[in-house]
């Protein structure tokens, strides 16, 4: 019986860890799907593009979770260094307010 009492907390911990990993995977899939919807904004983020985004772009941007978008921008900002390139310098000020 004592062995059973010592196993129960271990089993509960294992279940909690597994559940948190499933939640994290689900959040990542939701984030990826939301980011894929931002393809509607692609025509508006190239040089010489129209200055007013479409309603589809605005709707897609509104539906993306703030943390999802900020995390993606943070990850993207590290890519040049990981490719042994200097950091990007865009001139002017870029604001990642609340990221």
UniProtKB/Swiss-Prot annotation:
Stamen-specific. It is found in: Secreted. Keywords: Disulfide bond, Secreted, Signal. It comes from the Eukaryota. Disulfide bonds join 31-68, 41-57, 58-83, 70-90. Its main location: secreted. GO terms for cellular component: extracellular region. Residues 1-22 form the signal peptide. Belongs to the A9/FIL1 family. This is Stamen-specific protein FIL1.
């Amino acid at each position: 019986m004592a062995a059973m009492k010592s196993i129960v907390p271990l089993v509960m911990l294992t279940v909690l860890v597994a559940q948190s990993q499933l939640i994290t995977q689900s959040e990542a899939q939701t984030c990826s799907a939301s980011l894929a919807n931002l393809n509607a904004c692609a025509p508006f983020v190239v040089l010489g593009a129209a200055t007013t985004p479409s309603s589809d772009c605005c709707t897609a941007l509104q539906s993306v979770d703030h943390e999802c978008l900020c995390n993606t921008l943070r990850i993207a900002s590290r890519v040049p260094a990981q490719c042994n390139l200097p950091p990007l310098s865009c001139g002017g000020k870029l604001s990642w307010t609340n990221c």
